[in-house]
């Protein structure tokens, strides 16, 4: 990966300018960065902001080339990312990569205790079946499948999709409590920590949206009607004005799309006969025998 170096302005004025695909600005070659794997080139500032944004939001895969039409579908290597971002952001990137590695490894899992969160090893023999796992750090014994306290001779409880395990290893999982900082995604079972803010949560692993308090799915609740009634009423964490503004934006988007279809429909109806006519002429021309 090439990085920018600064040179006197009189030298830069003589160099050809290269267009950045992200900001569409024109820069000298030395102000650009080339991704080694695919040779796509962007201005260094744009690529740096792109990488930092993905890391701060919590990436789920390797950082890919920002060009959606990249022919090689390249990815940034770790050394390229390290040259671009600050040390604390790079540390978070390595942590995210490690968490992803544990998530994909069938022989390793996280200790479910919120006060521990150590990595535990599973026995490779019978890995597809629930097995007893003992954390080497806090000595808690739990089920590898549902992460509940070990339950020999019993099936995994169906209501263990969302659980929270406090520091006391003798107590059972708590769920559906407003004050617990860690809960599990109802879809993929990954642990999610909520510091503060909005109660509408989105799992970074599976992109499932749900309510933090009652764990109900919000995937189809674009207007956040869920927080207008029931036990979660007015618990969204935003002012009433901000909720109304959000709903206005959503309704405006759908209304604009519908209006666009309404305006375009007469033109589509008028254009359809011409398209069909041209297609029929082309087909007729193909069927005519060649002159001899």
UniProtKB/Swiss-Prot annotation:
Function: E3 ubiquitin-protein ligase which accepts ubiquitin from E2 ubiquitin-conjugating enzymes ube2l3 and ube2l6 in the form of a thioester and then directly transfers the ubiquitin to targeted substrates.
Entry's localization field: Membrane
Membrane-spanning residues: 250-270
Binding-site list for Zn(2+) 1: 20, 23, 43, 46
Organism the protein comes from: Xenopus tropicalis
Membrane topology, from the record: Single-pass membrane protein
Protein name: Probable E3 ubiquitin-protein ligase RNF144A
Gene3D superfamilies: 1.20.120.1750, Zinc/RING finger domain, C3HC4 (zinc finger)
């Amino acid at each position: 990966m090439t990085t920018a170096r600064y040179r006197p302005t009189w030298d830069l004025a003589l160099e050809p300018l290269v267009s950045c695909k992200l900001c569409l600005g024109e820069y000298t070659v030395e102000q650009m960065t080339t991704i080694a794997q695919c040779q796509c080139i962007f201005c260094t500032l744009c690529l740096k902001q792109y990488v930092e944004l993905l890391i701060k939001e919590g990436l789920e895969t390797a950082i890919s080339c920002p060009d959606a039409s990249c022919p090689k579908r390249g990815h940034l290597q770790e050394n390229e990312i390290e040259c671009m971002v600050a040390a604390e952001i790079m540390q978070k990137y390595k942590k995210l990569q490690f968490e992803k590695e544990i998530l994909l490894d069938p022989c390793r899992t996280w200790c479910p205790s919120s006060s521990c969160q150590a990595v535990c090893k599973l026995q490779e023999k019978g890995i597809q079946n629930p097995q007893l796992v003992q954390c080497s750090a806090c000595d808690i014994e739990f089920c590898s499948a549902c992460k509940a306290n070990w339950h020999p001779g019993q099936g995994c409880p169906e209501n263990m999709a969302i659980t929270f395990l406090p520091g006391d290893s003798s107590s059972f999982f708590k769920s559906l409590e407003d004050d617990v900082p860690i809960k599990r995604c109802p879809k993929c079972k990954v642990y999610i920590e909520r510091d503060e803010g909005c109660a509408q949560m989105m799992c970074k692993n599976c992109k499932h949206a749900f309510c933090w308090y009652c764990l109900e799915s919000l995937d189809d609740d674009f207007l956040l009607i869920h927080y207008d009634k029931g036990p979660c009423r007015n618990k969204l964490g935003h002012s009433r004005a901000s909720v109304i503004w959000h709903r206005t934006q959503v309704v405006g988007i759908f209304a604009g799309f519908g209006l666009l279809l309404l305006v375009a429909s007469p033109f589509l109806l008028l254009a359809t006969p011409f398209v069909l006519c041209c297609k029929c002429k082309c087909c007729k021309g193909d069927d005519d025998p060649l002159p001899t």
